[in-house]
């Protein structure tokens, strides 16, 4: 389906299946907001999709390695890089999916990330509970279509011990307060990524996913 449609006006969204991540919950949440979401490692299907989701949970290094073992590292890098340029299809990274977009992580410093967002991932500081496993308030850094339809300062759900720090602060779409100002979301062009789990964030998370689906309906640029 080269038009990126699931066949019934629902945009086809490829959730990259490399054996690790919040796959089923992400798929169900996307379907709930009107997408035809497919868990897939099929490059032809991914190429036909109107949008791409890069999930991830667990250790940074293992996620990057598993993505490569599934033959999807180059696919994810190309899709996210093109999206960040404001062209191509929308891409959404979730949790470690956000972290993998960076150059690397202190969790596994020997493993390079995808290098789409210049910067590194760091351990949350001493003096705070690790992981952050709680609801927290998003503070938007500026206008973004990710926030369309949301009340100011929405609550979303986090589970993480590491946080991403872009070299260029303009990548930061939202932050949260957790002893320090933690990057909660990044955005550039048509590339979005969240440290929090939208699929676990009740109505606010579903709204963010709905906004992503709406972006996929705009087609390839």
Regions found by a protein language model. Name each.
Residues 194-221:
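Acyltransferase
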Residues 14-16, 92, 157:
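Conserved beta-strand elements of the Class I
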Residues 181-187:
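Short, surface-exposed beta-strand/loop micro-motifs that present aromatic residues
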Residues 49:
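An anion/phosphate-binding loop that grips the pyrophosphate of nucleotide cofactors and donors
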Residues 8-14:
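Extreme N-terminal starter segment of soluble prokaryotic enzymes
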Residues 153, 187-192:
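Beta-strand-turn-beta hairpins that frame and shape the catalytic cleft
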Residues 58-134:
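Cysteine-nucleophile active-site neighborhood
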Residues 103-178:
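Pocket-forming structural segment of enzyme catalytic cores
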């Amino acid at each position: 389906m080269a038009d990126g449609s699931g066949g019934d006006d629902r945009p086809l969204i490829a959730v990259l299946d490399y054996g690790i991540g919040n796959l089923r919950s992400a798929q169900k949440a996307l379907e709930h907001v009107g997408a035809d979401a497919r868990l897939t490692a099929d490059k032809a299907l991914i190429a036909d999709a109107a949008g791409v989701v890069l999930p991830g949970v667990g250790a940074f290094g293992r996620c990057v390695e598993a993505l490569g073992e599934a033959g999807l590292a180059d696919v994810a890098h190309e899709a996210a890089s093109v999206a960040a340029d404001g062209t191509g299809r929308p891409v959404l990274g979730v949790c470690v999916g956000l972290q993998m977009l960076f150059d690397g992580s202190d969790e596994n410093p020997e493993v390079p990330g995808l290098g789409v967002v210049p910067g590194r991932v760091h351990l949350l500081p001493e003096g705070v509970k690790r992981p952050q496993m709680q609801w927290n308030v998003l503070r938007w850094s500026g206008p973004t279509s990710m926030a369309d339809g949301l009340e100011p300062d929405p609550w979303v759900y986090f589970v993480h011990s590491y946080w991403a720090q872009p070299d260029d602060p303009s990548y930061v779409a939202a932050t949260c307060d957790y002893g320090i100002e933690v990057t909660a979301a990044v955005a550039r062009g048509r590339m979005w990524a969240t440290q929090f789990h939208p699929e676990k964030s009740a109505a606010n998370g579903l709204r963010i996913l709905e906004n992503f689906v709406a972006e996929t309906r705009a087609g390839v640029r």
